[in-house]
Amino acid sequence: MNTKGRVTIPTDMDAVPETLDLLKRWGADAIRDCDGTEFPQELKDTGAKIYATYYTTRKDNAWAKANPDETQQCYIMTPFYTAADGALTIPLMTGISRELMKVNDHDDIARWWEVIDRTTGEPLDAAAWHYDAATESVVIDAPAAYHEYTVSFLAYLIWDPVHMYNSVINDWKGVEHQIPFDVRQPKTHAYTMKRLREYLESHPYVNVVRFTTFFHLFTLVFDELRREKYVDWYGYSASVSPYILEQFEKEVGYKFRPEFIIDQGYYNNQYRVPSKEYKDFQAFQRREVAGLMKEMTDIVHAYGKEAMMFLGDHWIGCEPFMPEFQQSGVDAIVGSVGNGSTLRLISDIPGVKYTEGRFLPYFFPDTFHEGGDPVREAKENWVTARRAILRKPIDRIGYGGYLKLACEFPEFLDYVESVCNEFRELYENIKGTTPYCVKTVAVLNSWGQQRAWGCHMVHHALYQKQNYSYAGVIEALSGAPFDVKFIGFDDIKADPKVLDGIDVLINVGDGDTAHTGGKVWEDPDISAAVKGFVHRGGGLIGVGEPGGHQYQGRYLQLSAPLGVEKETGFTLNYDKYNWDEHRDHFILADCPDHDVDFGEGKKSIFAWEGTEILIQRDKEVQMAAHEYGKGRGVYISGLPYSFVNNRVLYRAILWAAHDEADLHKWFSTNYNVEVHAYVKNGKYCVVNNTYEPQDTTVYTGDGSCFDLHLDTNEIKWYSIEG
């Protein structure tokens, strides 16, 4: 077995001996610095590839302070304020960290700010309000009594939010606040290209420039107590300035409004059905950002180095699943791996030479402290991500943070050594081939490919009570033997043939969100295309409130193919008699007690006559199966990630696709164990996803089977005979 390569480790000025030791122990072939660390010159000639973290928008306060007009900016909306009698005063910075932002009253506030009557939804004329700079407040002289008002305004980001986060989490003392500057603007643009060339001249030993990242940070706001106030890993509200917005107006031919970004205070988060204007803005940003990225990567290539992009931080506008990214010149992608979905978020990116996953835990004091258990976190991270790697591998793995902290935990060092060796073996066995896929599955939502593998993600891989029952579907798919695609409603509208070749469609989420479609179902072309796909023999799985939107006598617009509807009160007058359960169904055959954990589930779902209810609780349907024309629909109220739920989804997809007969092909009877086949490479593996020994019966591609015992987390490799 190869014991060297495909691993990147962090270093620091005071960690040279430790770095040299782990280069050998972990078989690492690349070294990197991190935020808050420096690269020691003693390691230049180790033979390892050297990554240098490069910040395009910060770590140069001399420039930032000399050019305050080109500091990065963000759109912010105040809370709602209710008018009574007389004038209404709205303070702008309430709930916002003054270390993080300051009001931009330098640019024309009448043009770039907006005061909105939230009771009517109408913006106020600029003459109806004025700004009091002394109190940093907007005053509405004659508001309508008991109407609610908000102010949307531009603010300068005077402390880079990521640097602020790192400073707060690590309790850094005496560290100068790094001010982010806007590379899109003329002076800083020219300076940035000069600065990059000078950096490359002075760092000839660097092999890979690890851009962290490019130009605009995702939306990250802190309050006065340095607490996280608002976060959206996909948020575009910090990618704005009058300079950028004037360019946008010229391109699209209509006037910009702050509301295009503010979106009633929801900031166009991925649960909101995106407006035309917001989609226009994103497309504009993608084109502009990709062009500027190409300038920088061309410079890097001219110096004979590789350009790597960190998937995160200042990555807004990069959008690696969209076509503009292919013109950016980026050689490699590295991203943080929190679970299987975030692994696929990296490994599925097309058009780069290689991808790398930065595994957890990060070597920071929040995990590496007395009483901390980094081994447990590392095990959970690796075993969770491994499912996805076995479907679509990244090319490299790595770690980040303070190496000396990790070295205080010898058991952690031992475990990571085993991970590195296992990854190399895994990669050698599956590289260059597509694993066996049982079916082609497409997740249908408003975002399509743009949010591939990131559906239902508010912050990077973090749990949310309101969405874990939906995110579990995406997580299950990340390591399942399916060819998974992501399709948008716009794709269907443009060409219904996009559904050709799909076996099963999945629509998952709450009603009137971007994930289920909302008002898009009022478009008869889209509604008919999806229902026609099922009626002609396709499969449909709806989770939560699929197609949820009140329209023309239905709440669930996919009610017909799924055979269920939600009781909103409008149909209480109708009696319902279909409540018999059919827990002996194919889908439930592997479930303990033929029951399922639906997570938060859904209230008030009932089934139409002719629908088979698999599980109902207190006369609320949790799972149902329905024949629709030549096709089939499956309704599930929620499906949090677990090994048994992986199996539930697997069987649901097979049943929806009329393919129950293919169950015993590359299959494990124990749902804690999975089988992955790489027919082109003549290999298959059986993997134990748990922390306990497991016994199973394994079925191969020809339907033959054998019994197998696996140790904790064990993976066994076999050759495909014949």
At which residue positions do the language-model features occur?
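Short helix-loop-beta junction
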Residues: A461-F486
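Hydrophobic targeting/anchoring helices
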Residues: L43, A62-A64, L196-R197, N207-F214, ...
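Extracellular ligand-binding/catalytic regions of CAZymes and related secreted enzymes
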Residues: L220-D223, Y230, K404-V438, S478, ...
